[in-house]
Amino acid sequence: TKVAPVYETVGRLAEELPDNVALIGFAGAPWTVATYMVEGRGSRDHAIVKQWAYGDPDGFGQLIDLLVTATVEYLGKQVEAGAEAVQLFDTWAGALSETAFQRWCIEPVQQIITQLRRNYPDLPIIGFPRGVGAGYKTFAKTAGVNGVSLDWTVPLDWTVAELQGDVTVQGNLDPRLLVIGGAAMEAEIQRILETLGKGPFIFNLGHGIVPETPPEHVGRLAEILRG
């Protein structure tokens, strides 16, 4: 299949990584994958996919159901190849209204997790509904995830009060600070560690690393975290 190289890569990494380094598999969540399938590219307003989702929810739901099935298979094969945890990225979750977020983001993730846990009951699963604000709390309480990855706009004190009692939180350095480096980056790293480090926490960026990030800044980040 076209994704066979993914499983091969996961398997090779699993063989080479030391025992104290976890290998995390990942997939796009159904809503976000659907946005790219329908729009054909990234979109500022997601007008085309929203027209379908809001105007013909039964028809759009059939696409989401197909993506749920495909995602369960995709993540399951990554686990079989050696992934020790998985993460679902819903990059465009924040584009939806509250009710649409429930229907097109939370419910499909719930279905994926239910099906994965039949075969992998102890598999750690992280969700990333980027940009949903207070919706992170609903997601953490209802989606069935073990961890929630946070974008860089989420207030840290709110995270401690509203999320860390329910799930492990992951995040949330602004990727642009990793590009900039220096004192600004290091101050924010320390603030995140000091605020979130008292509870269940995985340090990470608040979204993906950007191409122009200097490798030495990544090295400095790793040095701080290991120190």
Give the location of each predicted region:
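Active-site loop segments of alpha/beta catalytic cores
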Residues: 2-227
